[in-house]
Amino acid sequence: MTASADIRLSDVRFSYGETAMHFDVTITGGEIAAIVGPSGSGKSTFLNLIAGFETPQSGIISINGVDVTHLPLADRPVSMVFQENNLFAHLTVEQNVDLGRSPNLRLNEEDRKAVASALARVGLQGKEKRKPEALSGGERQRVAIARVLVRERPVLLLDEAFASLGPALRHQMLDLVNKLRRETGMTVLMVTHTPEDALHLDALLIFLDNGKIAAQGPATEMLSRAGPEALRHYIGEMRSF
């Protein structure tokens, strides 16, 4: 079981182009949070700061009480899944997951058992020897999630990981992630352009606007008629397209 880890961004400031971003928030360990907001509002930057792809100009980022602000990406207790390019095309499903245990693909018996267990948990038994090109989009993302499991990091970041999937398949993947979160205790942050995903998961919803956290709260409250006006306006604009 993966230990839960709080995530704290304390007065974190970062500039991207002409957008000055400011984040001050705590995500409780074991929670699932959905990050929503207009394009350019800072959603991916928010995740990149936590993952270590970006370094804040000021402020502190801590995970489980440990300051990781200047910790190298590889040393952070974080796994990240993107919409595309999560897998190596020349490796099999099994080998892609093996990388989560050993970058040189040298696994011991315990590692192999962990990989087999992860593939079973995401429903990929019998597909271990296939290459990514032989998989559907949903199956490829399941491989990426299996690799997350064998890495045993307490924080999972999803940057629009399921955006290219249809609604039914996207919900299947969200349900899988939520099931694994409950089993492992990991903290999950996901960027999505579909606020209803947060409702589907009964998640914490964090609404970003112009590089700042404009509102946050339980999705059931945030997406109700009594929710923040800025969020209602954003959703209304989305549905007008």
From Swiss-Prot:
Which Gene3D superfamilies does UniProt cross-reference here?
P-loop containing nucleotide triphosphate hydrolases
The UniProt entry, under Pfam families, shows:
ABC_tran
Q: Which InterPro entries match?
A: AAA+_ATPase, ABC_SmlMolc_Importer, ABC_transporter-like_ATP-bd, ABC_transporter-like_CS, P-loop_NTPase, Thiamine_ABC_ThiQ
| Localization of this protein | Cell inner membrane
Per its record, the protein catalyses:
thiamine(out) + ATP + H2O = thiamine(in) + ADP + phosphate + H(+)
Matching entries from PANTHER family are given as:
SPERMIDINE/PUTRESCINE IMPORT ATP-BINDING PROTEIN POTA, THIAMINE IMPORT ATP-BINDING PROTEIN THIQ
Q: What does this protein do?
A: Part of the ABC transporter complex ThiBPQ involved in thiamine import. Responsible for energy coupling to the transport system.
Q: What is this protein called?
A: Thiamine import ATP-binding protein ThiQ
Q: What assembly does the database describe for this protein?
A: The complex is composed of two ATP-binding proteins (ThiQ), two transmembrane proteins (ThiP) and a solute-binding protein (ThiB).
Q: Which UniProt keywords apply?
A: ATP-binding, Cell inner membrane, Cell membrane, Membrane, Nucleotide-binding, Translocase, Transport
What span is annotated as the signal peptide, if there is one?
A: none
- What is the membrane topology noted in the UniProt record heading this document? Peripheral membrane protein
Q: Where is the ABC transporter domain?
A: 7-235
**Binding positions for ATP per the UniProt entry:** G37, P38, S39, G40, S41, G42, K43, S44
Q: EC number(s)?
A: 7.6.2.15
The family annotation for this protein states: Belongs to the ABC transporter superfamily. Thiamine importer (TC 3.A.1.19.1) family.
Name any GO cellular component annotation: plasma membrane
- Encoded by which gene? thiQ
Question: Would the keyword Cell inner membrane be found if you checked this record's keyword annotation?
Answer: yes
Citing just one GO molecular function, the answer is: ATP hydrolysis activity
Main subcellular location: membrane
Recall the taxonomic lineage recorded for the source organism: Bacteria, Pseudomonadati, Pseudomonadota, Alphaproteobacteria, Hyphomicrobiales
